[in-house]
A protein has these predicted regions:
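Residue(s) in the substrate-gating loop at a strand-loop-helix junction
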Residues: 130
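C-terminal helical subdomain
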Residues: 164, 170, 188-230
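Substrate-binding pocket helix/loop in short-chain dehydrogenase/reductase
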Residues: 86-87, 94-99
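Active-site helix of classical SDR
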Residues: 110, 146
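Conserved glycine-rich cofactor-binding loop
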Residues: 10-11
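Conserved NAD(P)H cofactor-binding loop of Rossmann-fold oxidoreductase domains
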Residues: 78-83
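Active-site-adjacent segment of SDR/Rossmann-fold oxidoreductases
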Residues: 135, 156-166
Length: 236
């Protein structure tokens, strides 16, 4: 049985991937701040409460997780949030907190998991990036900074870990219909062609696991067929 660690497992893309894995017999260790939103009645689901923005606590957290779950051979790095406004409207603390969760936490978690996978001689790491990591847009300065950072990190880690049998795949979706937009002033328009569904991404990740070890998929870019937005209120 494969075993996966998923950060951001309680909602959105992470939740969909967890459900897909569990439905296909893959054990899931889920990292999230609030598991009340997703608590499947599955003996193979292990919820671990963690605030991944507290980056100094992550090394000890990962040490504990891997000690208790040495069978982990899949990691989905998906935790994060969005905040979109002009750069000058962010405080220094907001910038630090944003980059800590959306970039630094991914790097620290991957540092622990890649060492574990190298010792096993195999493993799959999926990093959830964004189309904002491919092209920068206004009011997405911090989000693009984090996602461009993840893209470069994934490329370098792939070259570093590949010879040890560890595959690294970066997934860059466009707008996905998830609770990500709950706190934002905009969201994809209701027409189904304006957003990717989480199940689409979960299927791609699961199907990748079925490919032979010698097949590497460096990066996957996904876009909705159209990109109309609905604004909930007037943007400032």
């Amino acid at each position: 049985m494969k075993a996966a660690l998923i950060s951001g497992s309680s909602s959105g893309i992470g939740k969909a991937i967890a459900e897909k894995f569990l439905g296909n017999g893959i054990k899931v260790v889920g990292l999230a701040r609030d598991h009340s939103k997703f608590m499947p009645n599955e003996k193979h689901y292990i919820p671990i409460e963690a605030d991944l923005s507290k980056v100094k606590k992550l090394p000890e957290l990962m040490k504990s997780i891997l000690k208790e779950n040495p069978d982990i051979d899949v990691f989905v790095s998906g935790a994060g949030y969005g905040e979109f406004k002009s750069l000058e409207n962010f405080s220094s603390l907001q910038i630090e907190n944003f980059i800590d969760l959306n970039l630094v936490s991914h790097i620290i978690l991957c540092r622990a998991i890649v060492a574990h996978m190298k010792s096993q001689g195999n493993g799959d790491i999926f990093i959830l990036g964004s189309e904002a990591g491919v092209i920068g847009k206004k009011k997405a300065t911090l989000y693009s900074a984090a996602k461009f950072g993840l893209r470069g990190f994934a490329q370098a880690l792939r070259n570093e870990a590949g010879p040890a049998g560890v595959r690294v795949c970066l997934i860059n979706p466009g707008m996905v219909r998830t609770p990500f937009f709950d706190t934002l002033e905009f969201e994809p328009d209701a027409l189904e062609t304006n957003a990717i569904e989480t199940e689409d991404i979960a299927k791609i990740v699961f199907d990748f696991l079925g490919t032979r070890q010698g097949t590497i998929i460096d990066e996957i870019n996904l876009s909705p067929a159209s990109k109309s937005l609905r604004f909930k209120k007037t943007s400032k």
